[in-house]
Amino acid sequence: MGYYVNTEDINITVPKDLLAPAYQAVLDLNENDDLKRGGSYGPGEKREHWFSWMPQDLSTLTDLQDVLTTLGFEDTDYNEAGDLVLGSYNNKTGQEDLFLDAIAPFVQEGSYAIWKGEDDTYYKWEFNDGKMLVIPGEVEVTWFPDKAYSAMDDWRRTQEMMAEFSATYATKNKEDSNA
């Protein structure tokens, strides 16, 4: 079970000088068990809480990069300036939205992520004025029947172009060798 999503486009950056407060904002999430969807639920047991797909104690994650990578943002890394740049996401949803909302005040203005769900639903995260907005959207496909072609005709056209290129190249080489 679960709902799979992937980022179609992502450009989210946390500036170097804001990494520490952003990481602290993530650690502060740990104090509110009501936000956590993961946990253990045995009768007569002490109930344990954690965020989906995350360790129970977020402080075991060493820094913001570790947090975001554990959340599922692959290839999250530092750029040459030392800013943290989020990588792509392609997995089940967990609670990424809460973590990114928590660090929104520290995310570079104008950052965004465009998401596509397994049911072809689109939405966008936009970061402005220290907030993350979730914006639903839809994609429309436009077909161009007047530009239609057959695969075989396209293959032949490509072969003709390659033959013409080869002939031109052979002529040029012959001229160069006679010079």
PLM-predicted stretches and their roles:
Residues M1-E45, E175-A179:
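Short, extreme N-terminal segment that most often corresponds to the first beta-strand
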